[in-house]
Every structure is written in structure tokens, then in C-alpha cells.
Amino acid sequence: MIKAAYFPTIIYAKDVNLDNRLFEKAVIDWSNKDKGIKRTNMKGWHRTTEMHKIPVFKPLVDELFKMQNEIFQEEWLESEPIIGNMWANINPPGGYNRPHVHPNSHFSGVYYIKAPQNSGQIIFNEPRATAHMVMPRRKQGEPPPHLWREVRVNPLEGRIIIFPAWLWHCVDPNESNDIRISVSFNFIQKGFNV
């Protein structure tokens, strides 16, 4: 039998060594001065979206561009990546993010500044809506990845995760006794009009 996998959904990840304590201090200072904005964040804080222009975050922005340039090459994309927007999130105990996508972007991602154990997994959902029309019963046990209906990823300090902006995702409630701090961002092709 010939077997081929078409239409894959690629999720990229990379661990980087940056000064997360410096980033944490900057984000907490902002949250003490700025009430934030409401998007998909429930019980959490979401900063306004021009964080990539703030000098203290340049080392992170540089790492994001390195990774995104590699992804653009692998994905055969013309032009070059630009950051559409970037913002910080603080999810206190009980805080979570509702299911959402990121319109007007090609790739979205997250970087974890502070991620205590049990502070909420990011969950990526099966993107093919018609795959839910008739869901077969499966054998007991762990099916191979190509049969999964969702992918759960534990947050890890210093990890960047980048995924297609159209991929539905959410964040589980923070069940730790501490805050989780992350940075979210969107990339688009330079010159692309949305």
C-alpha cells in the first residue's frame, strides 16, 4: 500500500536563552500602570500591541525574526517577514484564553517568559472542519499523531512556538499558584495588503 501525508499543519518550536527576568520586570511594571485590553484573555491581562518597538525586547524580536526567516524559506514564501503586532499576556491563577485565530496574519506565535508547572497548556485544534462530520470510533490507546483531534503543548520558559495564524487554539486555565507571562505576536509578508 502507498501512503502519503498531504496538507500538513506545521507547528514550529525553538528554545532560546534570553533574559526573562528583565522581560518579566518590564511586563509587570506595565501591568501595574496600564489596565490592558480585552481580547481572548479571561481573568488575565493583555497589553496593547506595539511591544516589538520597545528597546528592552529587541533581543526577543531578533530571535523571532531569525526563526521566522527560516520558516519563510521552508514555506517557500516570497518577500520577507514583518511583525504585524506583538503584546504581553499575564494569566493569573484561573486565567485562560478562549479559542481564537489571528486574522490578517500569516504566522502567529508565543514566547514564554514565565511558565510555572500547570500554568495552562496551549491547545491546537484540528483545522479541517469537515473532519468532524463523521468521527469514527478508534481503538483504545494513543493513536498516531496524524489522527489526533487536538495537540496540547506545555508552556516552557524560553520557548518560542510559531504556527499558522489560521490554526484555532486556546489556553487552558492556569492551575498553578503563580502568574504565567507570555508574549504573543503575528507575522505577515512585507508588502502584503490585508
Regions found by a protein language model. Name each.
Residues 22-28, 32, 62-128:
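Non-heme Fe(II) oxygenase catalytic core, chiefly the N-lobe of the double-stranded beta-helix
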Residues 91-162, 189-194:
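Catalytic core of non-heme Fe(II) oxygenases with the double-stranded beta-helix
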Residues 97-100, 169-176:
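Short beta-strand His + acidic residue motifs that chelate non-heme Fe in jelly-roll/DSBH
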Residues 177-187:
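A short alpha/beta connector and helix-capping loop motif
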